[in-house]
């Protein structure tokens, strides 16, 4: 069964950089990097691995960087 997950991204600026992701299914996820570009580059593999650990297979992932939103379809 296919279902969609919407994740809001909040960028927190600091020495290490930080992305905080929130959704109904995923209370929070924090990804640290040296720059905002690095954080966004790492977003796809980190989310795929996390969802795989949870037992969901990612079918599509759309990362809307300007809108600070990630949409994931899983089965």
Name the predicted role of every residue range.
Residues 27-37:
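A short, exposed loop/beta-hairpin motif centered on an aromatic-Gly-Thr core
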Residues 1-7, 12, 37-75:
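Short, charged, surface-exposed hinge/linker loops at domain edges
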Residues 12-26:
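Short aromatic-glycine-(Arg/Gly/Cys) micro-motifs in beta-strand/loop hairpins
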């Amino acid at each position: 069964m296919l279902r969609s997950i919407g994740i809001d991204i909040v960028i927190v600026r600091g020495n290490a950089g930080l992305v905080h992701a929130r959704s109904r299914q995923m209370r929070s996820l924090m990804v640290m990097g040296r720059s905002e570009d690095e954080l966004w580059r790492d977003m796809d593999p980190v989310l795929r691995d996390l969802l795989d650990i949870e037992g969901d297979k990612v079918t599509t992932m759309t990362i809307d960087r300007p809108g600070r939103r990630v949409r994931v379809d899983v089965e």
